[in-house]
Amino acid sequence: MGTFEIKDTFYLNGEPFQIISGAIHYFRIVPEYWKDRLEKLKAIGCNTVETYIPWNMHEPQKGHFHFDGMLDIEKFIQTAQDLGLYVILRPSPYICAEWEFGGLPAWLLAEDGMKLRVNYEPFLRHVYEYYDVLLKKIAAYQINFGGPVILMQIENEYGYYANDKDYLQLLKNKMTESGVVVPLVTSDGPFEANLKGGRLTGVLPTGNFGSKTEERFDELKKFTNGGPLMCTEFWVGWFDHWGNGGHMRGDLEQSV
């Protein structure tokens, strides 16, 4: 059993703790390679692995859930723990992640009038029914119960999309009612409009960026209420679109 808290910094079992995490998305890698990839993550100095959870993979048809093979998230979490890594989970209904429909199931659009990522009862009903299955599986792996999970995230980059605080609060309520006890965070672009739209009272905001670190953290600091600064996604590259020119990143000095 253990504890993880957010105060002026992060505290693991009562001691200050610096999260050094890297992203490995279990659903993009065959299970036979999970251990290898996690060992490599640890070898470069990371103490934590972070992953999204794609709704459209785990519930490709309404009410039909899949958590085996590449989608065996419990096995992935356990493998990380066996290697001495902590885990950050991002079980947002929407994940972006350069993934089909941002991880939302396409069958949502079969309902007339469907409204996504807002306080709309038909949408939230589907989210809740999915969470009833998902959160029951992952709650037992929280650090408070002897597992490696130290943080979970609410939604994803919501400030780019809307600012429906009722929606965010309802997601938080559902998570806590379903047994989530580790601290929760939000994750947004480190700009005033994004942070205002995506933040939620009592939840630590974190930033996503890939350059001008000092400037980005200065903006994020305005919203953390004295809490720690965290970059949830530090982009070391960028994707190319078919038919467009390629992207070339600057040097390390420009990035940091």
Language-model features: locations:
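Conserved, mostly hydrophobic/aromatic
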Residues: 14, 41, 49, 80, ...
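Short, solvent-exposed turn/loop segments enriched in Gly/Ser/Thr/Pro and often Arg
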Residues: 27, 49-56, 90-100, 150-155, ...
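Catalytic-core region of carbohydrate-active enzymes that cleave or remodel glycosidic bonds
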Residues: 75-81, 85, 177-178, 210-256
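N-terminal carbohydrate-binding accessory modules
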Residues: 1-48, 78, 82-86
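Aromatic-lined substrate-binding rim segments of carbohydrate-active enzymes
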Residues: 34-100, 172-177, 181-182
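Active-site neighborhood of glycoside hydrolase catalytic domains
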Residues: 122-201
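Aromatic- and acidic-residue-enriched carbohydrate-binding clefts of CAZyme catalytic domains
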Residues: 15, 52-64, 69, 73, ...
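An active-site-proximal structural segment forming one wall of the substrate-binding cleft
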Residues: 69-89, 111-149
